[in-house]
Regions:
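Extended, loop-rich substrate-binding clefts of extracytoplasmic carbohydrate-active enzymes
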Residues: 36-40, 190
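Primarily the internal scaffold of c-type cytochrome electron-transfer domains
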Residues: 3-27, 51-244
């Protein structure tokens, strides 16, 4: 699921994003592009590699990693709903074992997770992932640009969190008085329950990590027919109504 998702292709494995950052760095240098990296390029940025122009490291594993599992699940605190990377992320204490070059240590890590998954769950599934899902998503799905980036002034980028909050489905907006019966979060639509035989699947279901939304271009150029169909089905499922 994740392998096909837009989260996987958030970084320099996305040709449109790659060209945008290459052009930005050609014009204004590497420092302003860090504004984008805090949400798009964790493997590059958090390893201190963004001082070097991305043209020189496009083919590195870090540049091709996208947003991995730990990009979301290693976050330990959400600062606010102001967006623009408003989160605190920590190096997972169990990661040294799972990423070890020693196959015995990696095997021991996997065995321990299956025997006693509690520490793994506590490390990677914080209460806010479930209880404050929209606030968690706002850390990267609410964006602005400011003078250090555009040499102009503060301007709003996209803002999916406030749009959700002001809508009827959130249970927090003025239109919520007539629908729905139960408020919906980001995950209600973008991480629907799907069947799975994963050992962690409650009642045989997990939250989909395809993150279907509006981007049909990525699965099309990636020749990923399954992901493309999932996104098309999502867009055709009466997701939006317009009040006139």
């Amino acid at each position: 699921q994740w392998n096909s998702s837009a989260h996987h292709f958030s970084s320099f494995n996305n040709q449109w994003y790659r060209r945008s950052i290459e052009y930005m760095q050609d014009v204004v240098g590497t420092t302003p592009s860090k504004w984008c990296a805090g949400c798009h390029d964790h493997a590059v940025f958090f390893n201190g590699r963004f001082e070097r122009p991305m043209r020189e490291q496009i083919d590195t594993p870090e540049a091709q990693a996208g947003l991995s599992c730990t990009s979301c699940h290693a976050i330990v605190h959400v600062g606010s709903t102001m967006g623009q990377g408003e989160f605190v992320i920590e190096y997972p204490p169990l990661h040294d074992l799972s990423a070890s070059d020693n196959p015995i240590l990696r095997g021991a890590h996997d065995l321990l997770i299956n025997l006693a998954p509690g520490p793994h769950r506590e490390t990677f599934l914080k209460p806010f992932h479930r209880d404050q899902g929209p606030e968690f998503c706002s850390t990267c799905h609410k964006v602005h640009l400011d003078r250090p980036v555009n040499d102009y002034r503060w301007v709003r980028g996209f803002n999916e969190y406030d749009n959700w909050q002001a809508s009827g489905v959130s249970g927090q907006g003025a239109r919520s008085f007539y629908y729905p019966d139960t408020p919906k979060t980001c995950a209600s639509c973008h991480m629907p329950l799907v069947r799975s035989d994963d050992p962690a699947a409650d009642d045989g279901y997990v939250r989909s990590h395809r993150f279907p939304a509006a981007n049909t271009a990525l699965p099309f150029v990636n020749r990923d027919a399954v992901q493309l169909q999932a996104v098309q089905d999502f867009l055709r499922a009466d997701q939006i109504s317009v009040d006139i």
